[in-house]
Amino acid sequence: MPKLIDHDRRREEIAEATWRVIHAEGISGVSIRTVAAEAGISTGSIRHVFPSKTELLVHATELVGQRAWVRIQRHLAEPEPRALVLSVVEELLPLDAERRLEMEVTVALIAEAPGNARVREVLDESYEVVREVCRRLVTRLRRAGLTAPGVDVESATTVLHGLVDGLAIHLLINPDPDFRRQALRMIEASIDGLRS
């Protein structure tokens, strides 16, 4: 009897192998061959799922967003708005090995994007999703009375989004636990600053 393959799981395993190759060798090390070797499967098996390197990179990019969304959803039932905002923002920062790897992959793919329109398209979509998450967080704070009455939601969204993106890069460069604590305090100060 032929072996049944869970195609969604196989796609995820291949994307994870792509992440590991990017982590070890950078984006230039990614090929159907290197990813197949990392995943422990044949190049034919990879080509069956991802006919090109671009499709492989696109799925690797999409998986980063999917994983972040799953983590974010765990916090959406948090009744206290400030705690909700802080917990969601933390999910967007490279504060552990899993999120650090995802951020390394994202940065590598950002560098690849100017020469790859399809990767650029997926990254643009991811950018808009994160911006919308930030907008909803600011709106939630405003509705809960945790911002000044006249706060400009769009401006506050831009500030929060920029702070998250900037701190993500800084945390990637400097994973020191003291800096992690400082970064989280900066997020808290920014959120609390919306009250004035």
Report residues per predicted region:
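Short loop-to-helix capping motifs
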Residues: 26, 112-117
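Generic hydrophobic, amphipathic alpha-helix propensity
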Residues: 7-18, 35, 60-64, 68, ...
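Hydrophobic/aromatic-rich alpha-helical bundle segments in the mid-to-C-terminal region
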Residues: 83, 118-124, 142-194
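Helix-turn-helix
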Residues: 13, 17-59
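Amphipathic alpha-helical packing segments from all-alpha helical-bundle domains
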Residues: 74, 98-107, 117-143, 155, ...
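Hydrophobic alpha-helical connector segments
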Residues: 59-62, 70-103, 153-160
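Residue cluster at the C-terminal edge of the helix-turn-helix DNA-binding motif
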Residues: 21-24, 38, 49, 67, ...
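A ubiquitous short alpha-helical element
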Residues: 55-56, 88-95, 121-128
